Design a protein with these regions (language model features):
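Hydrophobic transmembrane alpha-helices
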Residues: 1-66
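Residue-level signature of transmembrane alpha-helical entry/exit and packing/kink sites
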Residues: 16-24, 49-53, 64-65, 95, ...
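Alpha-helical transmembrane segments in multi-pass membrane proteins
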Residues: 23-31, 53, 57, 68-76, ...
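Helix-loop junctions at the membrane-solvent interface of multi-pass transporters
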Residues: 33, 37, 59, 86, ...
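Interfacial aromatic-anchored transmembrane helix boundaries in multi-pass membrane proteins
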Residues: 35-45, 73-110
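Juxtamembrane membrane-interface segments at transmembrane alpha-helix termini
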Residues: 57-59, 63, 79-85, 142, ...
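Structural signal for the C-terminal ends of transmembrane alpha-helices
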Residues: 59-63, 113-119, 181-186
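Membrane-embedded alpha-helical hairpins and interfacial helices in multi-pass inner-membrane proteins
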Residues: 120-190
Length: 190
């Protein structure tokens, strides 16, 4: 016979899993939608994927954010067309090791760092933390592009520069939405 403490722990874990499963499924679906939805932008179309990755870190914290991103990554690795450009540009490992690999790897750091944002942070603190959070995605993306295509001005022109203002817009928008995200989170958890 289990003692009360052990039973309570098992009930808590079961409740946690029952809460996490739909969250993970929903969040990976939202990441996929954000990757597939192209916003017209010059010279390269942009997606809202970085916005969603940061929002997941903010909303669910580091641990759950990483778990969501790992699930999304594994879905893509096993051949589900969850990434931008899939299945047209390949699926699974062949897509992951393509031009976007560095960005995909950077998402893990970005979601983790976004999980550091607190409800009580002031707007400028939120913006600063989000800028710091997105930098690894672009650094790793830039490094990977340079490794596979060679180091030239084109990498900066196509792989980083076009997205700077778009990222600043997304970061500002998310920073303004953070209080609402935390309110919704508290409501859903109650």
């Amino acid at each position: 016979m289990l003692n009360n403490k052990t039973q309570n722990k098992k009930i808590f874990l079961l409740k946690e899993v029952m809460w996490l499963l739909p969250v993970i499924v929903f969040a990976t679906f939202i990441i996929t939608l954000s990757a597939k939805t192209k916003v017209p932008f010059y010279p390269v179309p942009m997606t809202m994927q970085t916005f969603v990755i940061m929002a997941i870190g903010v909303a669910f914290g580091k641990r759950v954010g990483l778990l969501i991103l790992l699930t999304y990554f594994l879905e893509g690795l096993f051949g589900l067309p969850v990434f931008a450009g899939t299945p047209e540009k390949g699926i699974g490992l062949s897509y992951i090791l393509g031009p976007t690999c560095g960005y995909l790897m950077g998402y893990f750091i970005t979601v983790y760092l976004s999980g550091n944002i607190k409800d009580e942070d002031k707007i400028l603190t939120r913006i600063t933390k989000l800028i710091i959070a997105i930098i690894p995605t672009y650094v790793l993306g830039f490094m990977w592009l340079g490794t596979i295509f060679g180091w030239n001005d084109t990498i900066i022109k196509l792989g980083v520069a076009p997205f700077v203002f778009a990222e600043l817009f997304k970061i500002t928008l998310l920073a303004l939405l953070i209080p609402h995200i935390f309110k919704l989170k508290k409501y859903l958890k109650s």
